[in-house]
Amino acid sequence: MLNTCYTLITGASEGFGRALAIECASRNMNLILVALPGPELHYLTHFIKRNYDVDVIAIEKDLCKDESCMELYTRVTELDLQVNMLINNAGIGSTVLFEEGTVSLYEKQIKLNVLATTLLTRLFLKTLQRNSHSYILNVGSMASFFYLPKKEVYGATKSYIYFFSKSLRKELSKSNVHVSVLCPGGMNTNLALTLMNKSGNYLSRLSVMNPEDVVPVAIDGLLNGKEVIIPGKMNNFFMLLDKILPNAIKKIITGQGMKKLSAVNPFTRYLSPAPVLIK
């Protein structure tokens, strides 16, 4: 194990974060895995150590809590770990009518999706700048490009991630730090989301991907310096449609989508109003 640098991944214990961790380990990257306290993080750590010749540091941290980002940065600094890749993956999603969502849900969603990503990027930036090449991958969403009922706050937080990443990339364009934003569509990251995704219409089902299929595209795009990474042919097709369709037609489509969302979906009880960790 000659590599002495580390890739830090937040929301790493399950779903997309777990897939990211395994993909990075398969590329001989040492890992700092950050996730909520629980057995999943330790299971993943042991799995990677058994199967890959990389070093793995597991840090339990609830990034919704005040001072948690500073505590994480301090812990990494105390361990004298050199981070050359930061993947801000942790986030909270939800599918709920805005008026039915709790204040606590929206507060946590904004803290984790927006504030934690911003603060961790700021805290680790000087560390990243010490390397010959460093990378920041912020996990956004296709939701940042569309007006989605029941996902108003989630979509808004991902719009922030999109514009924050693009602006920071421009600011750091002459430095050694490369910034990319990943904008996936729906992903089958847990059982409830898998069931709900299968209950969608034909086009929405075509756009859904498994985390294991997204992560190679994400890491390849990051290492190749791609600014915006949109995995999947169908998702790229949707982006093309969004550019060429008149607003009037998009409003009609959104209205039809609202009617479908207003119908009772047997799987939304697993998703709302409680938050779903997007990892």
Give names to the regions the model predicted.
Residues G11-E14:
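Conserved glycine-rich cofactor-binding loop
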Residues V181, Y202-M239:
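C-terminal helical subdomain
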Residues L97-I110:
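Substrate-binding pocket helix/loop in short-chain dehydrogenase/reductase
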